[in-house]
């Protein structure tokens, strides 16, 4: 009978793809005691690796004799065969064995890099609610230290919550945080609101940092500032992150007037409710689930009329984001251009109807001019009368240099300062974890993994039809059309050879290499924590990390060489390879248009 059960169990493991060793490791994890190291008043729990062994992740390589470990277990506990008094011991060696309940648990100390560290403790003592709902906010406390261990902030945490779109679906989560007091963290400017970027899909952890560094070097205004840091939540090591400034209307971030503050002040004054929640105000316009598909529509928040004595300058400031149609629904304010491009409002998030009318009209005139044969819209305005040519050129060059698949589609920003004569500006840059050949490869015939091929200048809209990923319409992006304009190409060429090319070459040759060495130990710890390479062997993880960083460096270097020779040749016809036969594609376009007509004519746009 025992042999029969053994055969059945072996068959179950074989069919499930799970090894007996893995099963035993999972069982041991469930029964394992919790071991917590006290590092300067901060708890650091050991982590159960995929190999069935346990890991303490700390930044201090000279740890011997400094830190006390507490073992939470019932019954006697042993360290390397010696019984512990009070179930505590002083960490001495880089590895050892804890015995509890007759089971041995081997542990290792993994030293991270000398990076800043962030320790977050939530009120519940858990991150489960945050991970279950991206919008859930949890308060707590937070300690932030610089690379020398000096305190940058130690106090209340108003909240930690999820952030991101596709990145939120990954194992290692990105977060937004709000601390209780405006603080100038690491000299990045005073603010309460910050982001923690996980870079889970980027094994080098360097793509976002490389682009932000390069954008700062070439003078793209309001580029996010950042530091690498190791993050712990409730004692659990989460890996290496970017602590980064957020894109918001703020004199220390994007220096434009904050219309959200103005609108909230008016709404409170008009309602007489000091505790008014802006989310309680009704939406207006086309705000339903399918609104992002319907060209020429707008949505806003019904801000009450300003009481006597209040004035509003609706000329600015604005921060706009190009977005995919399937994400448009979740935003409070926005508009869809006549060429199907959804634009959401980063600021003001709660835009009034008058503000939406103003900014959507301005952007539409810009788009019309870009797509016109002579670069002028029906009013005779040239696109450079409406938008700043230099920022457009710099933004495009950064995007083309890193071969970013998302540029012109999503996470693509414009801002407009207040003033009737002020222009739209391209930027700030944001979100480059799938750049530099770290993506699905080809789209519309462009190979984003080939450093010697133009990509962004051939960009097409994506998912802005009812068919989602099938995307049957292939409408060109604004940057696609700009790259056919002689004056735009000339501006790119002039700026490149005036110094931008050299700065991007320096980023590729020096910044990426040097920074990879700086963060390597934390990248290795992160690789073990998240089983990135399928092994917990630190030496093997380090080898794999070096390969990932070298690939990025080589890609960026090759990309810089390619653009140095070919940038002046961007002025070419758009390039599309249909993913569907022409007949089927045309049929689906007609179905899409019929669907949109039904939504509009039967007044389903807000359903």
Regions flagged by a language model, labelled:
Residues 25-89, 105-106:
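Predominantly extracytoplasmic/ectodomain segments of secreted and cell-surface proteins
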Residues 77, 218-230, 404:
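Short, well-structured beta-strand/strand-turn elements
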Residues 138-198, 351-358:
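Conserved oxyanion/phosphate-binding beta-strand-loop segments in alpha/beta enzyme cores
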Residues 15-28:
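Sec-dependent signal peptide cleavage junction
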């Amino acid at each position: 009978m025992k042999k029969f059960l053994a055969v059945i169990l072996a068959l179950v493991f074989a069919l499930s793809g799970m090894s007996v060793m893995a099963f035993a490791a999972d069982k041991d994890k469930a029964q394992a005691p919790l071991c917590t190291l006290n590092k300067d008043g901060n708890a650091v729990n050991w982590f159960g690796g995929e190999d069935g062994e346990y890991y303490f992740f700390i930044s201090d390589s000279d740890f011997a004799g400094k830190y006390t470990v507490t073992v939470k277990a019932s019954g006697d506990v042993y360290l390397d065969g010696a019984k512990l008094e009070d179930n505590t011991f002083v960490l001495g060696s880089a590895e050892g064995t804890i015995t509890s309940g007759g089971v041995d648990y081997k542990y290792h100390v993994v030293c991270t890099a000398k990076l800043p560290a962030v320790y977050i403790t939530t009120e519940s003592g858990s991150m489960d609610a945050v991970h279950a709902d991206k919008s859930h906010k949890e308060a707590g406390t937070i300690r932030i230290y610089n690379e020398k261990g000096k305190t940058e902030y130690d106090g209340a945490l108003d909240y930690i919550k999820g952030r991101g779109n596709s990145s939120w679906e990954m194992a290692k989560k990105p977060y937004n945080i709000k601390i209780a007091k405006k603080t100038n963290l690491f000299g990045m400017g005073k603010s309460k609101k910050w982001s923690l970027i996980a870079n889970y899909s980027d094994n080098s952890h360097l793509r976002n940092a490389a682009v932000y560094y390069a954008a700062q070097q070439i003078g793209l205004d309001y580029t996010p500032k950042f530091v690498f840091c190791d993050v712990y939540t409730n004692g659990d090591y989460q890996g290496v992150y970017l602590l980064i400034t957020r894109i918001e209307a703020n004199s220390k971030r994007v220096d434009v007037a904050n219309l959200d503050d103005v609108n909230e002040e008016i709404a409170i004054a008009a309602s007489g409710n000091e505790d008014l929640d802006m989310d309680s105000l009704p939406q207006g316009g086309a705000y339903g689930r399918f609104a992002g598909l319907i060209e020429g529509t707008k949505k806003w928040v019904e801000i009450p009329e300003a009481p006597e004595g209040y004035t509003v300058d609706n000329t600015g400031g604005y921060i706009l984001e190009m977005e995919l149609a399937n994400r448009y629904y979740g935003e409070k304010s926005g508009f869809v251009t006549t060429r199907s491009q959804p634009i959401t409002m980063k600021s003001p998030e709660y835009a009034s109807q008058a503000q939406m009318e103003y900014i959507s009209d301005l952007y539409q005139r810009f788009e019309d001019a870009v797509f016109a044969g002579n670069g002028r819209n029906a009013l005779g305005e040239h696109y450079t009368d409406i938008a700043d040519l230099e920022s457009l050129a710099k933004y495009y060059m950064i995007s083309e240099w890193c071969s970013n698949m998302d540029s012109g589609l999503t996470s693509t920003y414009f801002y407009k300062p207040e003033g009737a004569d002020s222009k739209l500006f391209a930027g700030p840059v944001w979100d480059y974890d799938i750049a530099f050949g770290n993506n699905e490869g080809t789209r519309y015939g462009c190979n984003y993994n080939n450093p010697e091929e133009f990509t962004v200048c051939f960009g097409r809209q994506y998912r802005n039809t009812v068919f989602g990923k099938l995307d049957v319409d292939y409408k060109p992006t604004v940057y696609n059309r700009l790259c056919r304009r002689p004056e735009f190409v000339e501006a790119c060429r002039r700026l490149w050879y005036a110094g931008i090319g050299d700065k991007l070459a320096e980023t590729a040759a020096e910044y990426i290499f040097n920074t990879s060495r700086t963060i390597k130990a934390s990248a290795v710890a992160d690789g073990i924590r998240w089983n990135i390479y399928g092994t917990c062997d630190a030496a093997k993880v380090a080898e794999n990390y070096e390969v990932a960083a070298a690939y990025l460096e080589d890609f960026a270097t090759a990309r810089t060489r390619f653009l140095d020779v070919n940038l002046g040749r961007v002025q070419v016809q758009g390039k599309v390879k249909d993913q569907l036969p022409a007949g089927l594609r045309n049929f689906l376009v007609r179905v899409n248009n019929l669907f949109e007509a039904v939504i509009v004519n039967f007044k389903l746009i807000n359903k």
